[in-house]
């Protein structure tokens, strides 16, 4: 395993299923790559200095999922990717983003953008596949994914158009995404935002005012 570069693992993602209707992890990775390019303006990435490393981080983000170490211990996902990226000679900003993509609140701007791209693809795709959380059932951890969209935006005080981001994500899904589904995803994320704001001590009327402006 160690002799291979991170990029060399990527094609093997075709053998790893993300979800039956949504294809393999390679399909998801390809979608994320296209989505990332569309979302660059929303992330404020307008120059080669940010667009290029962000694209590279998205391209390599999931490659470590097929390494032996991650296969044997899934909690190492991202961590192993970062190590492989550094050993493969990737830029440190790329490796850092790969390493923190699964954290609720990544610290680097490229890490945040990578995490949001991944989580939006999962939320929109899985909602469209009829796999939205119900009651206590949330097999794809979509509540955590939604909090993972909200928390970085709040923590880094980012001005990010969620509605537009969801619309761009919907265009790239391999199955149809209805307007109703898009609205449900937005409502679901806003619901998590409401929870997070209240946990931070914001009064109900303040939360309503913030969400009213969103």
Model-derived features: positions:
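Amphipathic alpha-helical "coupling" segments that flank catalytic cores
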Residues: 1-214
């Amino acid at each position: 395993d160690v002799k291979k570069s991170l990029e060399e693992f990527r094609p093997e993602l075709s053998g790893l299923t993300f979800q039956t209707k949504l294809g393999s992890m390679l399909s998801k990775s390809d979608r994320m790559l296209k989505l990332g390019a569309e979302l660059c303006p929303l992330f404020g990435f307008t120059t080669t200095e940010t667009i290029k490393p962000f694209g590279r981080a998205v391209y390599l983000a999931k490659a470590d999922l097929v390494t032996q170490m991650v296969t044997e211990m899934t909690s190492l996902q991202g961590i192993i990717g970062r190590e492989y990226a550094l050993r493969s000679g990737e830029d440190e900003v790329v490796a850092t983003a790969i390493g923190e993509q699964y954290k609720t609140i990544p610290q680097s701007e490229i890490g945040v953008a990578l995490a949001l791209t991944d989580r939006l693809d999962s939320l929109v795709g899985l909602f469209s596949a009829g796999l939205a959380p119900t009651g206590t059932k949330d097999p794809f951890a979509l509540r955590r994914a939604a909090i993972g969209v909200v928390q970085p935006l709040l923590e880094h005080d980012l001005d990010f158009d969620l509605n537009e981001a969801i619309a761009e994500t919907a265009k790239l899904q391999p199955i149809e995404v209805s307007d109703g589904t898009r609205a449900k995803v937005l409502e679901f994320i806003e619901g998590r935002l409401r929870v997070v704001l209240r946990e931070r001590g914001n009064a109900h009327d303040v939360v309503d005012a913030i969400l009213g402006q969103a």
